[in-house]
Amino acid sequence: ISGLFAKTSYGCMHQFVYSIIQIPLQGLGGNLWAMCIFTIAAQLLWFFGIHGTNVIAPIYTPIWLTLDLANQASVAQNGIGAGTNIIGKAFFETFTFGGCVLGFVILMAFFAKSSQYKSLGRLSLVPALFGITEPVIFGTPLVLNFTFFIPFVFGNVIAILISYAAIASGLVPTLMGASTIFGLPIGFHAAIQGSWQAVVLQIVVMVILGLVWYPFFRKADNDAYKLEQ
């Protein structure tokens, strides 16, 4: 088989697979709308109690890591902000930090009237600062809770669109594509990507998502407060 591929323009089987499979998939997974589709699919699975990230990640991770590697190579040669791709795994992990529920947790911890949501917010705050959101997802619960369906399923997409626009407009440099470990607190993912603007954008996105969550949180909190009286 190796001899047959050596006689083709691909040169080897690995290059053939890369050209025929990886490049078309990269075209799908390396654009804004594909990322939005992947994200909504993952959040829908989360809504039904399935770990959506683990289910969807094997599809997009190889594609997005390829884009990150291209950014790393470009930054190594030309400096911060020289990345050629806006989209990548680093972009996704930085700007959809913790499933974008940190703002919701802060609302519960500091603005809830009901003891139910206030207690849950305070218990979940520290984990959420480190991107750990299972206490919120299963404690609220957000699973099968149609009160929070819109912000829970579509919040990450809003974060992606805002962040993409900020980078595409030049307000924030493209990320350097650095891989990070899970469990870093908010701000660290962005700082590792090489610019203070990315840190500011991550915080701005969190605030905006908190505003998106607010009307849904207020309704649920008022209902819970009435039941407690």
Language model segments and positions:
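Signature of multi-pass transmembrane helix bundles
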Residues: 1-51, 180-229
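Hydrophobic faces of alpha-helical transmembrane segments in multi-pass integral membrane proteins
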Residues: 1-2, 29, 33, 37, ...
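Transmembrane helix-loop junctions in multi-pass membrane proteins
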Residues: 5-14, 51, 110-113, 133-138, ...
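Membrane-helix interface motif
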Residues: 5-14, 64-71, 168-176
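Short, amphipathic, aromatic/basic-enriched membrane-interface segments that mark the entry/exit
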Residues: 24-29, 117-125, 174-175
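Transmembrane alpha-helix interface/packing and boundary motifs in multi-pass membrane proteins
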Residues: 40-53, 65-66, 130, 135
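Helix-loop-helix junctions within the multi-pass membrane cores of secondary transporters/permeases
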Residues: 65-148, 152, 156
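Transmembrane alpha-helical segments and their short flanking loops
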Residues: 72-78, 123-126, 137-229
